[in-house]
Every structure is written in C-alpha cells, then in structure tokens.
C-alpha cells in the first residue's frame, strides 16, 4: 500500500457539490450515483490541504497576486513532467479554461466567422462558439474499432471552404481519450500554419496520460508551431481543485498575447481569487508524489472497468483511454434509441453519466463515465448497471 489512501470514501453531499447536490435540480432522481462531471472523488493531497488551511488561518483575504515563486513552481512542473520550459512572459492567468476559450473566440474571430472543432468533443467547445455568434464548423473524428483518428483532409478542406481562422484542439482528448502523437500534432499544425489558422490547445488533462503514451505540449513542437498557438493548462483536473477557479494560459506570440489580454480586460476580469493562487502554487509544489500514486490507482480502475464491461455487459464496447480518467462507452449494439438508453441508465441503473449526445451528434451512441473514484464506488456503479442490463435481457 502506498502513502495515500484512495480507497477512502468521502461524503460529498451537502457541500454544494455540483456533482452530488444538484441531481433533482437537473432533472435526475435524487438517488442516482454520479459518474458524470469530470472531477474526482478523492481528497486533495494532504500536503496541499495543509497549505490551504494555513492560508485560511491567516484570516485576511484581501487582493492577492501571484509572484515569482508562483511562476517558478509552474515552470518547474512543465519542465520536469513534459520537458517543456515556458517563458514567464507567455503566462496569462484566467479563472478557467472555458473562460479562456471564450476570450480567444472573441479576440481572434468576428461574429459569423467559422471556428473549427472535432466532435465528439468537450461540449463547452461548441458552447463558446454558439454563445458568441460564431459558426461552428465540425470535422468529426474518424471512429475506428479501438481508437479515433483525425480527419486531416477534412480539416484542410473545411478551413479553405469555410474560411476558418481559429481551431479549438483538445489534447488529451475528452471524451474519446486519445493522446495525439507528435506526428499527428505536427501534421495538424502544418495545415493550420499553411492557412494562417490559430490553434487553441486545451491540455487540461495532460497530467493523466497512461503507460505507453506521451503528452506533447503543442507549443513545444517547434518555434513556428508555438507562434501559431495558445496552450491552455490548469491544475484543476490534476489535483481536484476545479472549485478554486485557476488556469494558466501560455501564449508565446507577443501580438496574440496582447490581443488576448485586451479581450480579458474588456470583459472586466482582473485577478485570480486568493485561494486559487495559493492552491495552484501549492499543488504544483507538493503534489507530485500524490499524483504519481493516484495515476496508478486510476489506471487500475480503467482496467477494472474494461474487464467488467467485457465480462458482464458484452454489447457495450469500451474505448481504452490513452489519457484522461474519462471512459468512452459505445452502446450502439443495445436495442435502444439514445433517449431510451439514457432513461434506462438513469431510472433503472440509477446512474448519472454524461450522455454522448452532449459531445455532438457523433456521440449519440455513447456514454461517458468518470472512473476517478474509490474502487468500491466504481464497483457499486458497474454492478448497478449490470443488474439493469441483465433485467432487460440484453
């Protein structure tokens, strides 16, 4: 047994948890077991918890700003983990990556212009496009038997035909779990550079890349790629601190960075909250041993889920993720429409998953499940699904 106890089950109800306390308000039964939103059912590293407690005990929460140590800790993390050393001047802090995506859409496109994405993909990608009155240009990923691939020809064709100037990339990819290879990223980058398309790379899941795969920061592909990209990072998924509202955006191109900052200024945003700054710096400073153990635990959960579904629900096909703690389940062989399937899972299995249609029409046959939880919780959920599966005679 390691230093940290990931088997501990924490009662998250009555904490204003989006995951646990808002089922009824979101139209779900009160007794569903949630595996939907991408936060983890693990306590933060105890060393980080102590840092946060010490700051709270100080008792004063006035205006706060990051200092040299904040960036040095951040830089050290990326150098150690990804062999990428960002420059301090590239950093722009925001309260979240979705906010940063919206700011990029507003800063670098005009109303009515096309923004390209690859569905199925994290649903706020489409939201920030639609909400800002841009045209959503979708070039779907190519679904293979065991993994998805990028439709490079389709992307280049869409860029030319739809006059696309901005591309939102998800790497590691949520929900299909791909970790795009360096060759794939360079090919994508070459297309975008050729047609002067800015790439905004959401790399929030970069710390959860599984054995046999390597995350390549887009800005680390080479100078020309760095000049055509914005890299979005955050400690929120890595250390389960999404509620602290802090993200670190890296923009190597001076002109692009000035335009991005101007858009943030126009939105009236100025500073991160106190606990976000303390939590981010603290997490990257002390959280590495905890994360290394956690990754082993989650990888075991992933394998357990693959084996369990194959053995007991064989009409459901699991895509093994190369990264993220989210698993993409193909339910197309079930004799149910997407709506019927969702109602069956919610009302009979009593599970709250993210239905695949949230990620675009290309995800209609799928469900997404979050396996970043204690094994007992995962077993309880899968066993409930199995009982509902067997009761239907599938």
Task: Give residue ranges: language-model regions.
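Conserved N-terminal alpha-helix of the aminotransferase class I/II PLP-enzyme fold
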Residues: 55, 62-95
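PLP-dependent class I/II
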Residues: 4, 27-33, 38-53, 85-87, ...
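Short regulatory "switch" loops immediately downstream of catalytic or recognition motifs
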Residues: 16-23, 140-143
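Short acidic, glycine/Ser/Thr-rich loop/turn "cap" segments at secondary-structure junctions
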Residues: 57-60, 104
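Short clusters of hydrophobic/aromatic residues that line enzyme substrate/ligand-binding pockets
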Residues: 9, 61-63, 150, 218
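Conserved PLP-binding active-site segment in aminotransferase class I/II-type PLP enzymes
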Residues: 1-19, 28-31
């Amino acid at each position: 047994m390691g230093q940290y106890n990931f088997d501990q089950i924490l009662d998250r109800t009555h904490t204003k948890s989006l995951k646990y306390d808002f089922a009824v308000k979101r139209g779900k039964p009160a007794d569903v077991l949630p595996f939907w939103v991408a936060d983890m059912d693990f306590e933060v590293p105890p060393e980080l918890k102590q840092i946060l407690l010490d700051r709270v005990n100080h008792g004063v929460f006035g205006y706060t700003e990051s200092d040299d140590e904040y960036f040095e800790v951040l830089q050290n993390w990326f150098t150690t983990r990804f062999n990428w050393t960002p420059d301090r001047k590239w950093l722009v802090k925001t309260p979240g990556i979705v906010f940063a995506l919206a700011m990029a859409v507003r800063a670098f496109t005009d109303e009515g212009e096309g923004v390209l994405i690859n569905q199925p993909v994290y649903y706020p990608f489409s939201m920030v496009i639609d909400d800002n009155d841009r045209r959503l240009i979708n070039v779907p990923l190519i679904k293979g038997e065991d993994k998805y691939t990028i439709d490079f020809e389709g992307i280049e064709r869409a860029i030319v035909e739809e006059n696309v100037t901005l591309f939102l990339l998800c790497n590691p990819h949520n929900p299909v779990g791909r970790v795009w290879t360096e060759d794939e990223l360079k090919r994508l980058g070459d297309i975008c550079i050729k047609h002067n398309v800015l790439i905004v790379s959401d790399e929030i899941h970069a710390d959860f890349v599984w054995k046999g795969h390597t995350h390549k920061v887009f800005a680390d592909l080479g100078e020309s790629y760095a000049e055509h990209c914005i890299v979005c990072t955050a400690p929120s998924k890595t250390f389960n601190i999404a509620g602290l509202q802090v993200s670190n955006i890296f923009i190597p191109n001076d002109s692009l960075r000035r335009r991005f900052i101007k858009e943030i200024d126009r939105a009236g945003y100025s500073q991160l909250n106190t606990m976000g700054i303390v939590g981010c710096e603290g997490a990257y400073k002390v959280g590495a041993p905890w994360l290394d153990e956690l990754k082993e635990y989650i990888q075991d959960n992933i394998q357990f889920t693959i084996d369990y579904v194959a053995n007991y629900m064989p009409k459901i096909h699991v895509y093994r993720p190369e990264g993220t703690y989210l698993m993409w389940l193909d339910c197309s062989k079930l004799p149910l429409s997407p709506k019927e399937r969702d109602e069956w899972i919610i009302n009979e299995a009593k599970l709250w998953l993210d239905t695949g249609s949230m990620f675009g029409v290309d995800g209609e046959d799928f469900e997404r499940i979050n396996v970043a939880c204690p094994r007992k919780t995962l077993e309880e959920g899968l066993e409930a699904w199995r009982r509902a599966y067997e009761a239907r005679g599938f």
